[in-house]
Amino acid sequence: MLEFLSQQKPKILIIGDFMVDNYTWCDCSRISPEAPVLIAKTLKEDKRLGGAANVYANLKSLGADVFALGVVGDDESGKFLQENLKGEFLIQKGRKTPFKNRIMAHNQQVLRLDEEDISEILLENELIALFDEKIKDFKAVVLSDYAKGVLTPKVCKAVIEKAKVLNIPVLVDPKGSDFNKYSGATLLTPNKKEALEALKFENLEGENLEKGIKKLKEDFSLRYSIITLSEAGIALFDEGLKIAPAKALEVYDVTGAGDSVIAVLAFCLANEIEIFKACELANEAAAVVVSKIGSVSVSFDEIKSFKRVDFEKKIKSKEELLVLLKQNNKKIVFTNGCFDIVHFGHIKYLDKAKRLGDVLIVGLNSDASVKRLKGESRPVNSEFQRACMLAAFYFVDFVVIFDEDTPLELISFLKPDILVKGADYKDKLVVGADIVSRVELIDFEEGFSTSKIIEKIKDKK
């Protein structure tokens, strides 16, 4: 899919609150004698595209042919946006173009200074007329709302209705607690906080998530309902609830993660990619973005590199693993096996196991353990080779090798939340079941086993 998408250049129109993100990098090593505050010595300034302009930058970085429509003030920030974006901007005299100045010290944001005018624009009719003139040439429309006054109810209604007549998808990154102005859009991408405010729910845990995301779809006549869940991934409701798990390995700055998500979703829908696959790809894009500092764009090459993470680093000792698990409050899924010759059945089984939680750990029998269990002719592949093959799958987070005949000692040491075994354990004692919160039995794909593969090879000789 990535190879296909990286060759596409869909025309995408973006309307919304275009902003300037400024980063003032400082050295803060002294305390002021005037007051108990830090002295910030300016080292450099970095002006970047922000808000809807960052969505534009993400789409352009992905390879889209992007066109911006918006309203800016007659100021330096407005000029900066016009000079750096392809599109058409209406100039509202006296209006302040949103400008956010982040004061950075030692890679940490210590203060943000905002200049903006959040009143509704005076040029609604002109913006709608401009949209009507341009829309027929595009494959998707993005409404990027930061509640700075451009996306008024009148503008949103006109855009969504016109696009719907032309069968052009409209994707909305919403703001505020009233989503009525987005009714009829293809999808919205609220985060958990925004969704809670719109739904007036106390939480989105357990059954509430499915109830809430379904309610958004029905209440606002959406084609798809999406809620971004930060480190838990992306929730999608089409005909039912699905969760695309998050992919981030390290998080430095969440600025712009939502922009990358809607950019990837728009790019995918413009190319008629299935929606759940689009959500999975959006997660990978967000993982790239949060590993950097500031509002940054993401490319398909970066997503490819992210997917090719050094898999040997995923092979850990149980002691290393325990330290890592203590640092994060994640739902841990554990399964184990010999995985001597990895086959299609293993892949389907492990993929299903991963979907049960946040982190999937595979306990792998050592060579000595396999030999005791399977006989002198096994294993076919060494423990290191087997561990590397398992670690190469994106849905496997960690592999840990154990020498015992059963994983009981390892399970007791790591104390995972969920223990996964094959459905053939239905009437058997599951080792470690008394240690974990729950046991899940997963059906194997019929006709696939390492023993059958070995016999097949022998028969051909």
From Swiss-Prot:
Pathway info: Nucleotide-sugar biosynthesis; ADP-L-glycero-beta-D-manno-heptose biosynthesis; ADP-L-glycero-beta-D-manno-heptose from D-glycero-beta-D-manno-heptose 7-phosphate: step 1/4; Nucleotide-sugar biosynthesis; ADP-L-glycero-beta-D-manno-heptose biosynthesis; ADP-L-glycero-beta-D-manno-heptose from D-glycero-beta-D-manno-heptose 7-phosphate: step 3/4; Bacterial outer membrane biogenesis; LOS core biosynthesis
UniProt keyword list: ATP-binding, Carbohydrate metabolism, Kinase, Multifunctional enzyme, Nucleotide-binding, Nucleotidyltransferase, Transferase
GO BP, sorted A to Z: ADP-L-glycero-beta-D-manno-heptose biosynthetic process
Entry GO terms, CC: cytosol
Record-linked InterPro entries: Bifunc_HldE (IPR023030), Cyt_trans-like (IPR004821), PfkB_dom (IPR011611), RfaE_dom_I (IPR011913), RfaE_dom_II (IPR011914), Ribokinase-like (IPR029056), Rossmann-like_a/b/a_fold (IPR014729)
Superkingdom of the source species: Bacteria
Keyword ATP-binding tagged: yes
Protein name: Bifunctional protein HldE
Gene assigned in the entry: hldE
